[in-house]
């Protein structure tokens, strides 16, 4: 057999040469776990005569990726082989790569089609020696295999279909796209991003430095008018934004309902659904930048709208096709009054906005007053509130939607109160900003890699968390996101108008679960809950401090006066809570009142679905969904085991093929293994094994530092009306803005596992550990310089105030009393209202407290999202 070299020469396949290359790339890995000869044997078995060296490297990388379930170091080795292969195929010098991308001629048209803007090209040419020498290519080898494949698939720029960028080139391009000719800031951003302290959001990675640098992730659009002109102007705006990789949140409360009178034609309206289907087809047609990812719109509607029942069902897999829009995401913008009526089993009146104008323009007491006046005037149709609630829960169990966002909490606890009523969130329900027909709200995102701040002592005995460094990095990101506002390409003028006036930004996080596992803190532990508060207090303080410093240099944002912050009111003040005590808030508060802020909003933890894959961490602030899962790449599907768990089981001496097969049969859970220490069972609980009450409590703990909102998913193995009702009401009473992004449920029935030998899997429970305990660093809590100076008094005061300032009402409603002492996944529901329901038979079926697991209503359950997991 022979291999074809990159220069076209033929050379015999040499076993020793492959082994030598594998060994060379295994530096720093565990020599007792990495078997270069075994890897080479597997590679040779897949080689054919005439294979190219590129194909050989790809085969080697895939072979190591498949062996990740043997030891986590194989994942590192797979990445090194793949990245080494890319380095051989690409130009090393950054300035030359930029030149090639800028000078590209499209072979199909023969025309100049630059992928890099003239501005960035000129900056690189003027500073090429500095920039070329600053790049550290060894940092490419820190990516995981699947992180690198994610970059390769969607993020690295290509020439003639072939990848032209290296990961370090991308990072430098992003830094230049943000900071332009400010080379000092460019190098600072490059170094921190390449060292994996943080990442900017996908649109920034896609588009920074290109001729149309649309770097914003989120756009909140107002339906311009209830007319053909207004609807289609809005549709065009959505298409223009989606074309440049923006996600869309659109509120449609002002569109009249089915059967409403149309004066212009003397006819009646077809209602929301036919219009929604037009938006659905636009989302399908306009992908985000050449199939990098599909277009995505979320539609927000308040539950008083007369078409609400059809709206919540638009993603169902069954029913008439003409009333479905499965590529859109329905979301509810819920006033407190609706939740009260459901809780009381009271009436709820549905209106057409043409008959009951202005309901979406007011919130709180003003909304209640206007809504009840319209009810008294008989302008709508009255139903039981629980009938609508039942329909919402039924849709959520089948499709995971509609999303739940609480209108009054969003408007009551925002620094944009002085702008007007906020009417929607964004696609992922973490951005909460004011929008109007002439202002499309925009937000630029970045996420901090929380595991980067875990520090282990030199002797390996203790581990701690570096809050000072976290604070420092969060300030750098704030400066970056603020600069994106000025350097961004805006696809529509309404977006530029809004962003330049209010200048909101959004910092998020990724890898909170990884951080807990590195520090050996179970997700439900008190230490983990304390660290959760400390991390988010630190980031919030850093963003405000940086924004205040920017205001002193560049001026406050134009609508600062009249905002809560201008009066010294910060996010935790709006919750009637006091901060944990890590930082000096009083000095910062005075500085903000005196100098202002450069940005109206700064915090919004987002899902980080793609970027967390790049850095190799768990998404945002969520627990792990499984300790074993599949990763799909173009070449196939790979099994991946939680690397922290895998390392522990390997070191205990109980990891082998039977343990792997056991994990597959148990959907990644280790709770049923008698030979695994209880300490590990607690540490590696999946989200399905963690109390949802804990998830919501931790969300509320961090929410007092989040001036927008955060994308909170809820998880239930066996959803029932009672459980979902309990979760929603608990979150609402805790004061959350986003009550639920997706409802995640497990498959109703497990797929037949043809590849599993059950006898082999059963052997996993019989293994005996070779060591009695693992040698792992012990977490030592640390504060900041400020908190250490005032440790005793600050922590005691914080603890007392948090108890006093709990946003949960003290009165015991049927819902809150049931929630006080139970886990949300337990089969204990709020009490059924005592009054007799004197309605028609349809109303009697709507038992929102039923504990029976909800059965799928789809005629073909295999097509249902919930049933298929």
UniProtKB/Swiss-Prot annotation:
Q: Where is this site: Important for hydrogen atom transfer?
A: 218, 443
Gene3D superfamilies recorded for this chain?
A: 3.20.70.20
Can you quote a single GO CC term?
ribonucleoside-diphosphate reductase complex
Site (Interacts with thioredoxin/glutaredoxin) at 864, 867
Gene Ontology molecular function: any one: ribonucleoside-diphosphate reductase activity, thioredoxin disulfide as acceptor
Positions where Phosphoserine occurs in the chain: 227, 806, 827, 868
Q: Note the position of the cross-link Glycyl lysine isopeptide (Lys-Gly) (interchain with G-Cter in ubiquitin).
A: 387
Q: Which residues constitute the catalytic centre?
A: 426, 428, 430
* Amino-acid positions noted as binding ATP in the UniProt annotation, renumbered to this chain: 5-6, 11-17, 53, 57
The segments labelled Disordered in the record are 793-843
* Residues of the ATP-cone domain: 1-92
This entry's comment on induction and repression of expression is: Highly induced by DNA-damage.
What are the subcellular locations of this protein? Cytoplasm
Keyword set includes Plastid: no
Instruction: Please tell me where dTTP binds in this chain.
Output: 226-228, 243, 256, 263-264
Q: Is Ribonucleoprotein one of the keywords UniProt gives this record?
A: no
Recorded catalytic reaction(s): these are: a 2'-deoxyribonucleoside 5'-diphosphate + [thioredoxin]-disulfide + H2O = a ribonucleoside 5'-diphosphate + [thioredoxin]-dithiol
Q: Which BP terms in the Gene Ontology apply to this protein? A: deoxyribonucleotide biosynthetic process
State the UniProt keywords alphabetically. Answer: Allosteric enzyme, ATP-binding, Cytoplasm, Deoxyribonucleotide synthesis, Disulfide bond, Isopeptide bond, Nucleotide-binding, Oxidoreductase, Phosphoprotein, Ubl conjugation
Q: Which InterPro entries match?
A: ATP-cone_dom, NrdE_NrdA_C, RNR_lg_C, RNR_lsu_N, RNR_R1-su_N, Rrm1
* UniProt superkingdom: Eukaryota
Activity: how regulated: Under complex allosteric control mediated by deoxynucleoside triphosphates and ATP binding to separate specificity and activation sites on the large subunit. The type of nucleotide bound at the specificity site determines substrate preference. It seems probable that ATP makes the enzyme reduce CDP and UDP, dGTP favors ADP reduction and dTTP favors GDP reduction. Stimulated by ATP and inhibited by dATP binding to the activity site.
Report the sequence similarity comment from the record.
Answer: Belongs to the ribonucleoside diphosphate reductase large chain family.
Task: Please give the function described in this protein's UniProt entry.
Answer: Provides the precursors necessary for DNA synthesis. Catalyzes the biosynthesis of deoxyribonucleotides from the corresponding ribonucleotides.
Quaternary structure annotation from Swiss-Prot or TrEMBL? Heterotetramer of two large (R1) and two small (R2) subunits. S.cerevisiae has two different R1 subunits (RNR1 and RNR3) and two different R2 subunits (RNR2 and RNR4). The functional form of the small subunits is a RNR2-RNR4 heterodimer, where RNR2 provides the iron-radical center and RNR4 is required for proper folding of RNR2 and assembly with the large subunits. Under normal growth conditions, the active form of the large subunits is a homodimer of the constitutively expressed RNR1.
Protein known as: Ribonucleoside-diphosphate reductase large chain 2
Q: Species name for this entry?
A: Saccharomyces cerevisiae (strain ATCC 204508 / S288c) (Baker's yeast)
């Amino acid at each position: 057999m022979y291999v074809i070299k990159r220069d076209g020469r033929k050379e015999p396949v040499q076993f020793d040469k492959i082994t030598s290359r594998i060994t060379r790339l295994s530096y720093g890995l565990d020599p007792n776990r990495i078997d270069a000869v075994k890897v080479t044997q597997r590679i040779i078995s897949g080689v054919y005569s005439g294979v190219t060296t590129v194909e050989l490297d790809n085969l080697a990388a895939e072979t190591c990726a498949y062996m990740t379930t043997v030891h986590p170091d194989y994942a590192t080795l797979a990445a090194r082989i793949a990245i080494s292969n890319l380095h051989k195929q690409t130009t090393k010098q950054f300035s030359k790569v930029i030149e090639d991308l800028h000078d590209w001629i499209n072979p199909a048209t023969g025309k100049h089609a630059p992928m890099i803007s003239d501005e960035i090209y000129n900056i690189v040419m003027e500073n090429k020696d500095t920039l070329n020498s600053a790049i550290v290519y060894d940092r490419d080898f820190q990516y995981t295999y699947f992180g690198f494949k994610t970059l390769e698939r969607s993020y690295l720029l290509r020439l003639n279909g072939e990848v032209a960028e290296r990961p370090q080139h991308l990072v430098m391009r992003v830094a230049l796209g943000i900071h332009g000719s400010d080379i000092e800031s460019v190098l600072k951003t490059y170094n921190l991003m390449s060292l994996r302290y943080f990442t900017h959001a996908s649109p920034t990675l896609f588009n920074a430095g290109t001729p149309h640098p649309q770097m914003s992730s989120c756009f909140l659009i107002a339906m311009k008018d209830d007319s053909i002109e207004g609807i289609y102007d809005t549709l065009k705006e959505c298409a223009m934004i989606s074309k440049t990789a923006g996600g869309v949140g659109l509120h449609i409360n002002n569109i009249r309902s089915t059967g409403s009178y149309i004066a212009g034609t003397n006819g009646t309206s077809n209602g929301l659904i036919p219009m929604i289907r037009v938006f659905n087809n636009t989302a399908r047609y306009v992908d985000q930048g050449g199939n990098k990812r599909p277009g995505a719109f979320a539609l927000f509607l308040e539950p008083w709208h007369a078409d609400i029942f059809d709206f919540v069902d638009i993603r169902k897999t069954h029913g008439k096709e003409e009333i479905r829009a499965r590529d859109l995401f329905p979301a509810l913008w819920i006033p407190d009054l609706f939740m009260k009526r459901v809780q009381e089993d009271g009436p709820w009146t549905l209106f057409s906005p043409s008959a009951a104008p202005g309901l979406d323009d007011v919130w709180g007491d003003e909304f209640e007053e206007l809504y009840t006046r319209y009810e008294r005037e008989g302008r709508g149709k009255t139903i039981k509130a629980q009938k609508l609630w039942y329909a919402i829960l039924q849709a959520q169990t089948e499709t995971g939607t509609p999303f739940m966002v609480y209108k009054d909490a969003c408007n009551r606890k925002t620094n944009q109160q002085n702008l007007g009523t906020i009417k929607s969130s964004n696609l992922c329900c973490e951005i909460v900003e004011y929008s109007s027909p002439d202002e499309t709200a925009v937000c630029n995102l970045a996420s901090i890699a929380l595991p980067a701040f875990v520090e282990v002592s030199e002797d390996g005995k203790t581990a701690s968390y570096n809050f000072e460094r976290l604070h420092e990095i969060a300030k750098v990101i704030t400066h970056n996101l603020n600069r994106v506002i000025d350097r961004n390409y805006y696809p529509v003028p309404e977006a530029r108008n809004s962003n330049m006036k209010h200048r909101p930004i959004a910092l998020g996080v990724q890898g909170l679960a990884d951080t807990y596992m590195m520090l050996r803190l179970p997700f439900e532990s008190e230490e983990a809950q304390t660290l959760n508060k400390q991390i988010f207090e630190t980031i919030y303080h850093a963003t405000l401090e940086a924004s205040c410093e920017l205001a002193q240099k560049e001026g406050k944002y134009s609508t600062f006066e009249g905002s809560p912050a201008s009066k010294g009111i910060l996010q935790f003040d709006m919750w009637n809570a006091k901060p944990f005590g890590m930082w000096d808030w009083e000095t910062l508060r005075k500085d903000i009142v005196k100098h202002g802020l450069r940005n109206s909003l700064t915090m919004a933890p987002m899902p980080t679905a793609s970027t967390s894959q790049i850095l190799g961490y768990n998404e945002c602030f969520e627990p792990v969904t499984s300790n074993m899962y599949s990763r799909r790449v173009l070449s196939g599907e790979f099994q991946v085991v939680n690397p922290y768990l895998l390392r522990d089981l390997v070191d205990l001496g109980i990891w082998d093929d039977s343990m792997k097969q056991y994990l597959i049969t148990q959907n990644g859970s280790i709770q049923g293994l008698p030979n695994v220490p209880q300490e590990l069972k607690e540490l590696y609980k999946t989200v399905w094994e963690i109390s949802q009450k804990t998830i919501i409590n931790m969300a509320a703990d961090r929410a007092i530092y989040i001036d927008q909102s955060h994308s909170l998913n809820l998880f239930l193995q066996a959803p029932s009306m009672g459980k979902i009702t309990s979760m929603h009401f608990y979150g609402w009473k805790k004061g959350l803005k986003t009550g639920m992004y997706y409802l995640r449920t497990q498959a109703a029935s497990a797929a037949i596992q043809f590849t599993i030998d059950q006898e082999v899997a059963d052997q996993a429970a019989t293994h005996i550990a070779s060591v009695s305990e693992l040698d792992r660093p012990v977490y030592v809590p640390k504060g900041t310089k400020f908190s250490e100076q005032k440790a005793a008094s600050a922590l005691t005061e914080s603890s007392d105030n948090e108890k006093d300032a709990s946003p949960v009402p003290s009165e015991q409603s049927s819902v809150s009393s049931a929630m006080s002492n139970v886990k949300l996944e337990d089969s204990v529901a709020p009490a059924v209202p005592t009054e007799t329901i004197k309605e028609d038979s349809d109303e009697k079926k709507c038992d929102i407290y039923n504990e029976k697991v909800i059965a799928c209503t789809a005629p073909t359950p295999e097509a249902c999202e919930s049933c298929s997991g």
